[in-house]
Amino acid sequence: MEHILHVEDESDIREVARIALEDVGGFKVETAGSGREALRKAEESLPDLVLLDVMMPGMDGPTTFQALRKCPATAAIPVIFMTAKVQSHEVDRYKAMGALGIVAKPFDPMTLADQVRGLWRREE
């Protein structure tokens, strides 16, 4: 079973995604409500994938991504961004940073796991 760390500052979105990824997708999901919490949890649990919200207060998604890449323990963990503002130049920027791709919000809980799996498989 793949272990995903989902980082999202909005608790309702975190919970819907957790249910969608665990119950529909069969993933093991750990959650974090901020970039700082994500860094700590990623280093402790070494997830197989980080699903990372772009817009968060404090440490945003791109900043969190860069911090993950600087830490030797988490540098190779694949990252998929989630954002409500999907524009081609932003998608290109996140991919240039090294992200696997983008999941648009709002997302369909019934297809979220398949979207994540599809982006993840392209990397393998």
Regions found by a protein language model. Name each.
Residues 8:
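Conserved acidic carboxylate
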Residues 11-30:
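Two-component/phosphorelay signaling modules centered on CheY-like receiver
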Residues 18, 63, 86-104, 110-114, ...:
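Alpha4 helix (beta4-alpha4-beta5 surface) of REC/receiver domains from two-component response regulators
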Residues 31-40, 61-63:
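Helix N-cap/capping motif at the beta->alpha junctions
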Residues 43-45, 69-76, 97:
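Conserved phosphotransfer cores of two-component systems
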Residues 45-51:
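Active-site beta3 strand of CheY-like receiver
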Residues 56:
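Receiver (REC) domain active-site loop signature in two-component systems and cognate sites
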